[in-house]
């Protein structure tokens, strides 16, 4: 039975937050410590997406209140952090401060025994005292962490997948890809997923397909930096149109608004996608398994839509308060797979 995905954007104002009470490259990744993900008997599975917490060892209490309140309200089966999890070069001068910054955002999940997965953004690796490998080891030390450091097999740190079993446990009914979109290219522009990561994705998808009787396993994909095709959900308008945003990179002399025939939500800054098209989107079309791909990175963008090719792309705006954002609003995105 084909799974249906319902994406729900959650946004709380500052007032609401304050008032709330407190593997090998070709193989399918296995969840850690035997904690298999599985659909409930009612056929549902809930994923919460948290983006750009981007704080220090002295995490803003408003963010922590928001995380706690959202977990209690939605009761997700899995939480995915999509990068810029700590404030990078601002997090502090000791390894212990980095560890504490990570612990601040993970303890709400530990307290509720909720599994989580994580990818990195462009700021995580800017820490002066830890590498992304160091940070991944810190995340993986938690019993409820399903993230995997794939080692030297692939570029980046933390490209893996999480199969979700059917209600009866007999097969993989759904899949989640977690992709490291790296940080900056050789020219200082935003990077993206590299070729060997794309090859890994295709090999993994083919392995899942073979186990599923030759049919692609429907999947969600999460990464920090958007693909350039996010612009397919926008339309170009003349300079000066109210609500328009300036494009990024090769589109920096153009202005855009949300194309309401394809997408809904808001875009309050030009999408800062990877500067070069690495072929990731084309690979999704070829494989036919990506039901939706969702990104963080641009803190004030909260849009979701479907391209003419039939792939759903979307943003989740920032969660943290120690960064720029949409006034006092902060966001999380919920996915109910049914």
Where are these regions (language model features)?
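Sec-dependent N-terminal signal peptides of Gram-positive bacterial secreted proteins and lipoproteins
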Residues: 4-24
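Metal-dependent catalytic neighborhoods of phosphoester/phosphodiester hydrolases
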Residues: 59-62, 83-106, 124-144, 233, ...
């Amino acid at each position: 039975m084909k799974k249906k995905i319902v994406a729900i954007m959650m946004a709380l104002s500052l007032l609401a937050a304050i008032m709330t009470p407190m593997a090998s490259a070709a193989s399918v990744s296995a969840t850690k410590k035997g904690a298999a993900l599985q659909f409930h008997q009612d056929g549902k599975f809930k994923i919460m997406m948290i983006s750009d917490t981007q704080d220090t060892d002295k995490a803003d209490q408003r963010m922590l209140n928001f995380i706690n309140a959202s977990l209690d309200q939605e009761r997700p089966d899995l939480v995915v952090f999509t990068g810029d999890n700590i404030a990078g070069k601002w997090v502090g001068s000791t390894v212990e401060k980095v560890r504490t910054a990570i612990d601040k955002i993970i303890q709400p999940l530990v307290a509720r025994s909720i599994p989580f997965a994580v990818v990195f953004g462009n700021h995580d690796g800017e820490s002066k005292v830890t590498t992304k490998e160091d940070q991944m080891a810190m995340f993986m030390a938690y019993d409820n962490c399903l993230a995997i450091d794939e080692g030297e097999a692939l570029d980046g740190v933390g490209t893996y997948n999480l199969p979700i079993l059917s209600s009866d446990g007999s097969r993989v009914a759904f899949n989640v890809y977690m992709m490291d979109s790296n940080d900056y290219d050789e020219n200082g522009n935003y990077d993206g997923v590299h070729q060997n990561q794309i090859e890994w994705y295709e090999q993994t998808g083919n392995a899942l397909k073979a186990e599923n009787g030759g049919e692609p396993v429907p999947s969600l994909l999460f990464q920090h930096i958007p693909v350039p095709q996010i612009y397919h959900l926008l339309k170009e308008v003349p300079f000066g149109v109210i609500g328009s945003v300036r494009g990024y990179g090769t589109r920096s002399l153009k202005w855009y608004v949300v194309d309401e025939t394809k997408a809904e939500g808001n875009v309050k800054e030009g999408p800062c996608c990877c500067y070069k098209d690495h072929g990731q989107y084309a690979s999704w079309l070829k494989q036919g398994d990506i039901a939706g791909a969702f990104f963080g990175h641009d803190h004030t963008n909260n849009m979701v839509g479907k391209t003419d090719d039939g792939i759903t792309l979307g943003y989740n705006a920032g969660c943290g308060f120690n960064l720029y954002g949409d006034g006092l609003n902060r966001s999380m995105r919920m996915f109910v797979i049914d």
